[in-house]
Regions:
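Cleavable N-terminal export/targeting peptides
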Residues: 1-26, 33-80, 366-367
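Residues on the lipid-exposed face of transmembrane beta-strands in outer-membrane beta-barrel proteins
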Residues: 205-209, 260-266, 320-326, 362-363
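Alpha-helical transmembrane segments that form the membrane-embedded catalytic/substrate-binding core
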Residues: 140-147, 184-211, 319
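N-terminal targeting leaders of membrane proteins
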Residues: 54-137, 141-148, 152-160, 274, ...
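Outer-membrane beta-barrel proteins
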Residues: 153-159, 208-213, 264-273, 326-331
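Small-polar-interrupted transmembrane alpha-helices in polytopic inner-membrane proteins
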Residues: 102-106, 165-185, 201-204
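Transmembrane beta-strands of outer-membrane beta-barrel proteins
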Residues: 172, 176, 219-221, 277-283, ...
Length: 367
């Protein structure tokens, strides 16, 4: 797998022992994390462009539909315009053609810039499930969800049937990432990862299931990051090798600083309450002490140990924190609406309760 968060992929162990002959441990790690960065950046790009494309054409309105004789209400987003068949057809061709051209160009560029520079082999798979405390797998889950969310909004703009929009747009994230998984399967330096594939399907499935159940994303997947520095120079040096030296590289690659969240909008679940529509409660997952895929050790091409820190504990972290659903903030500004929608992919900084190593820890502000 290549890690994953944002087409996120994680650093991977090599698919066969002979790969060690081609790359030193540090080189493989850099290569795999480069893959991570290209995936994340591509997801961010898709998420940015999709709302721009749709919001630039139409404004959203909120329609309230009463359920039976009760006071329960559900919120459904639709467009002011009633599209003619010709308008729908034009938009469908525009979105479909844009997807094919943009994604095709991305894949060609990705192959030319990356895969063709490394040895190719027959299609093969490998098991990278034990690596990185599965933070990379959660990253795949998040990436597929965000891609699907962006794609679904594009298809919503076309005015196509609701079910078609949900299925076509909703499963786009899994499709986009699966193509890259296939390319990995033919690359000697990686391999097809069933764990990655499963996480991709589940991420897109989470969006599809919510749309069919609630016609809304009551539980949004989000991402946060805090930069990690250490008092031990050896750990900083190791982090430079694995995750890059700049803050932007660390943001994309450092699993020790990444947290993934499931943020539930409370008003959506309790419509009769007086809760503000933007208030959410989120559960987060992360890990620390990760200076290698499965253990904190690294070797060079000759098998010499270059980093060996079994004393550093590798552990999982769970979080509980309030959150703000920025997409629920009302505004008549298309630009601000887009900006808030984009930011809704990221966790809002807030107090948090952490559970790790069998203990609770409070954070005044966590991101």
């Amino acid at each position: 797998m290549r890690s994953s968060a944002l087409l996120l992929s994680t650093p991977v162990a090599s698919a066969s022992r002979r790969i060690v002959l081609f790359f030193s441990s540090g080189e493989r790690e850099k290569k795999n994390h480069t893959c991570t960065s290209r995936t994340k950046l591509s997801i961010i790009l898709i998420f940015v462009l999709a709302p721009i494309f749709s919001f630039s054409q139409d404004s959203l309105k909120t329609e309230f539909h009463k359920i039976g004789d009760s006071a329960d209400y559900i919120t459904n987003f639709s467009y002011h315009q009633t599209l003619t068949p010709q308008q729908k057809k034009k938009r469908i061709w525009l979105v479909a053609g844009g997807n094919v051209v943009a994604y095709g160009a991305t894949m060609i560029g990705l192959y030319s810039a990356w895969y063709k520079n490394y040895p190719q082999t027959g299609f093969h798979s490998f098991n990278d499930w034990p690596e990185w405390k599965q933070v990379d797998k959660v990253g795949h889950f998040y990436s597929a969800y965000i891609e699907s969310r962006a794609s679904m909004e594009l298809w919503r703009w076309t005015g196509i049937d609701r079910k078609k929009r949900i299925w076509i747009g909703g499963m786009s994230g899994a499709f986009y990432q699966t193509v890259i998984e296939v390319l990995d399967g033919f690359s000697a330096g990686w391999g097809w990862s069933w764990a990655d594939f499963g996480a991709n399907i589940l991420g897109s499935g989470a969006l599809v299931a919510q749309e069919f159940a609630w016609n809304d994303q009551r539980i949004k997947l989000k991402f946060s990051f805090h930069n990690k520095t250490y008092s031990d120079p050896a750990l900083n040096q190791r982090s430079d090798v694995l995750f890059g030296e700049t803050a932007s590289e660390r943001f994309i690659k450092d699993y020790n600083g990444q947290t993934y969240w499931a943020s539930a909008n409370l008003k959506s679940f309790f419509p009769k309450s007086n809760l503000p529509p933007w208030l959410s409660l989120s559960v987060g997952y992360g890990a620390e002490g990760l200076f290698g895929g499965t253990q904190n050790i690294a070797k060079d091409v000759n098998g010499n140990i270059t980093f060996n820190r079994p004393d550093i504990k590798r552990y999982r972290q769970w979080y509980l924190a309030p959150d703000i659903d920025l997409s629920k903030i009302k505004t008549n500004s298309k630009g601000l609406k887009f900006f808030l929608t984009f930011l809704s992919a990221f966790k809002f900084p807030a107090p948090a309760l952490e559970f790790s190593n069998g203990k609770f820890k409070a954070h005044a502000i966590y991101f």
